[in-house]
Amino acid sequence: METGFGWIEVDGMRYNHDIVIHADRTITKRKKKLSKGLKGEYGHTPIDDTELGFLFDEKPALVFIGTGQYGDLPVTPAAEQLLKRYIIVIKPTPTILPLIGSELRKFAAVLHVTC
């Protein structure tokens, strides 16, 4: 896995948007529109609990949150509360990629690719 400002590459596929790696290892585009209404409050579209509902069905042992190239993605208190049900790792996206690459447990990840 590799990342740079505005992109991430996973398994040879390049994505020019935020992604979610699901517990079954499929990859989808992050549904940040669900959190867009909070942009004014945070100055940036945060990650909110409304985006994390998929975790209930997937039941990962671990959740990774990649907070962007510089670690600027805000995590709302509601998201933090929901994430307390899981082992979580929240770090800048470039820092978190090696951890994801070596993880053997069932996990999910939300990865921000810009700031």
Give names to the regions the model predicted.
Residues 28-55:
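Compact, glycine-rich, soluble single-domain proteins
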Residues 22, 66, 110-114:
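Short beta-strand segments
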Residues 52, 79-80, 97-100:
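Short amphipathic alpha-helical segments and helix-helix/interface helices
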Residues 87-98:
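A short glycine-rich beta-strand->turn/loop micro-motif centered on a GG-aromatic cluster
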Residues 1-36:
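N-terminal, charge-rich interaction modules
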Residues 13-15, 55-59, 101-105:
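Flexible, charged surface loops at secondary-structure boundaries
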Residues 54-87:
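Mid-chain, well-packed structural core segment of small domains
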Residues 96-115:
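Short basic, glycine-rich beta-strand/loop surfaces that mediate nucleic-acid
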